[in-house]
């Protein structure tokens, strides 16, 4: 176990904003990152960027002071998922996720893999229903539950397995906080400031609505990364959230 970057070496942020980095070019990504302040947000690195640029890219972001949500959505046999989660913890990321549909044994193995890391372990979050999915998509998979009901079933399994929370849509947040309690973390993509295009997300909310619904961490992508002044956009979002708190 070799932690690459301890939490004490990074900037502390109280912002619930996690900016999704979706770049094809490493230099473009770092150019954007150098325009923003790690006190204003955390960063999400997904499958495309991690596949292109690897762990070293994560380290470069950490060296700039950012906490990293490694969004790789591990979904495999329990032993493989556990080793993958431990590797993410070795990298020193702030948060990592798995697919809840991988089942109880997989999620339990992933949680147990983080025990040796103690207080340095990342938050372990499970994905319920992707925000791009609608009821018709679930029907195609042979499921008769609505996206909301299926997400709640997976969230209940996640909590039973001892994980820290789930990725869910903002529409589910109010219900989930009531059912699973305030300590169960909710991470929500599809968050877009007023006036932003919906893009490929189907179930979206503004940051203020998400905060009111009980979302703990809100993932925002293109409204920040494609802004002409991303630093100011982040400050405006955070200011609006402080006013709404």
Swiss-Prot record:
Metabolic or biological pathway, per its Swiss-Prot or TrEMBL entry: Pyrimidine metabolism; UMP biosynthesis via de novo pathway; UMP from orotate: step 2/2
Active site residues of this protein: 73 (proton donor)
GO cellular component terms attached to this protein's record: cytosol
Residues that hold substrate according to the record: 22, 44, 71-80, 131, 192, 201, 221-222
Recorded superkingdom: Bacteria
GO terms assigned for molecular function: orotidine-5'-phosphate decarboxylase activity
CDD domains associated with the record: OMP_decarboxylase_like (cd04725)
Disulfide-bonded cysteines: none
SMART domains associated with the record: OMPdecase
Sorted UniProt keywords: Decarboxylase, Lyase, Pyrimidine biosynthesis
Summary of subunit composition and partner proteins: Homodimer.
Name the record gives this protein: Orotidine 5'-phosphate decarboxylase
Originating organism: Escherichia coli (strain 55989 / EAEC)
């Amino acid at each position: 176990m070799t932690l690459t970057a301890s939490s004490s070496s990074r900037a502390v942020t109280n912002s619930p904003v996690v900016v999704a980095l979706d770049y094809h070019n490493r230099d473009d990504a770092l150019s954007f990152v150098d325009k923003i302040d790690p006190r204003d947000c955390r960063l999400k690195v997904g499958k495309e960027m991690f596949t292109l640029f690897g762990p070293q890219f994560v380290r470069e972001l950490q060296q700039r002071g950012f906490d990293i949500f490694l969004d790789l959505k591990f979904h495999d046999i329990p032993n493989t998922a556990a080793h993958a989660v431990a590797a993410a913890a070795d990298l020193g990321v702030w948060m990592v996720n798995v697919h809840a549909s991988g089942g109880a044994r997989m999620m339990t193995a992933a949680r147990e893999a983080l025990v040796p890391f103690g207080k340095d372990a990342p938050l372990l979050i499970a994905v319920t229903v992707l925000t791009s999915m609608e009821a018709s998509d679930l029907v195609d998979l042979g499921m008769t539950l609505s996206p909301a009901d299926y997400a709640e079933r997976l969230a209940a399994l996640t909590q039973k397995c001892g994980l820290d929370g789930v990725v869910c849509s903002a529409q589910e947040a109010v219900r989930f906080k009531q059912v699973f309690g305030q300590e169960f973390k909710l991470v929500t993509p599809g968050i877009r400031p007023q006036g932003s295009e919906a893009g490929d997300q189907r179930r979206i909310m503004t940051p203020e609505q998400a905060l009111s619904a009980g979302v703990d961490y809100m993932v925002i992508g293109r409204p920040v990364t494609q802004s002409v002044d991303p630093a100011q956009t982040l400050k405006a979002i955070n200011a609006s959230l402080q006013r709404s708190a």
